[in-house]
Amino acid sequence: MKRLVRLVAYGLLTLVVLAVGVLGVAWWRMEAALDRVYTLADVKLDVSGDPAQVERGRHLAVTRGCNDCHGDDLAGRVVIDAGPIGIYVAANLTAAGAGMDANHFEHAVRHGVGRDGRPLRFMPATDFAGMGDDDVAALFAFVKSMPPASRALPETWIGP
């Protein structure tokens, strides 16, 4: 009986060590992928900012869910507050916040890549990767039409 208990204990210990090892390798690979710097080609967007383009951009922001994360005024908001697991804060897209140009905007929306070339952890870029240049330009025109707004927001962080 003692031998059986010892074998079960060693088996469980082995499983725990293997699980910790697999999780450690997965975490390490994820962090390495998120630290990768991407270089993207610039895209020439026709951003006229005329009322029709801005209205199209407003429509896209509402129907594609931009307002769900960035807020109705696009000034950012806390999207997920999971305590010790982490907190996700959507960026302020108005001139008071991100203040990005059309290329940085396109890189973020379609590719999920920030100004520094690193992945934006929670940007659902796969949802927008197929968006046409005209739609990205309209969305950018809408963002640029929003008045500057700011609010105190915590930093995004991901726990263990």
For each predicted feature, which ranges?
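Extracytoplasmic/secreted proteins, especially bacterial periplasmic and envelope-associated proteins
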Residues: 52, 56, 92, 104, ...
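Electrostatic cytochrome c docking/interface patches
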Residues: 37-62
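Flexible coil segments in periplasmic/lumen-exposed cytochrome c-class electron-transfer proteins
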Residues: 32-45, 71-86, 114-160
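Residues that flank catalytic or metal-binding motifs in active/ligand-binding sites
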Residues: 62, 89, 119
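The canonical Cys-X-X-Cys-His
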Residues: 57, 63-72, 105, 139
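N-terminal type II signal-anchor transmembrane helix
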Residues: 2-37
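N-terminal post-signal-peptidase region of extra-cytosolic proteins
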Residues: 77, 88-95
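Long, hydrophobic/aromatic-enriched structural stretches that serve as scaffold segments
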Residues: 92-123
